[in-house]
Amino acid sequence: TSPLPPDPHMCSSDEEQTRSPLSLYSEYQRMDIELRSPHAMPASHWHGQVEINVPFDGDVEYLINNEVVQIKQGHITLFWACTPHQLTRPGSCQSMAIFNLPMHLFLSWPLDRELINHVTHGMVIKSLASQQLSTFEVQRWQQELNNPNEQIRQLAIDEIGLMLKRFSLSGWQPILVNKTSR
């Protein structure tokens, strides 16, 4: 498979001039969901959203802030994507959900304060339980976020917020602690 085209809303470590992920905040307010085969990235990148990754059929490996992070099949993992990150090993995974949530939306949801603090301080968080989400839900949310009916779009956003509420209540743990926050 060919690499993904450059995204104007993301920064990459192979750019000649670096940009702050916060400078991208005003450019991109929509929630984005992908369901696809993960690809190894040639360089790390960063952006202003909260990223959620769910590999459905195999483990994947990231380099996040120069630390190796394993994301296990079926587990939900989230982090603030202003931290440089790079998918280094897609393994045998053929189907992975990648959510990019605008930070203002993430902060508006009634989630565990400790979870929010960990994410906003650069930690990577994973669910203790697997299989909290299916590809069926991800595909439905993808379609509904592009629906012309604003109420349908809002319903998808509300359901994603509830998915994170379930994540928050079902048990989670930091798997990468920001070195600067210790």
Task: List PLM regions with ranges.
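Generic protein-terminus/edge-of-domain signal
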Residues: 1-63, 67-70
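Tight coil/turn sites that cap or link beta-strands
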Residues: 38-39, 73-74, 82-84
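Histidine-centered metal-chelating micro-motifs
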Residues: 59-61, 77, 81-87, 106
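Short acidic-glycine-tyrosine-enriched beta hairpin
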Residues: 66-80
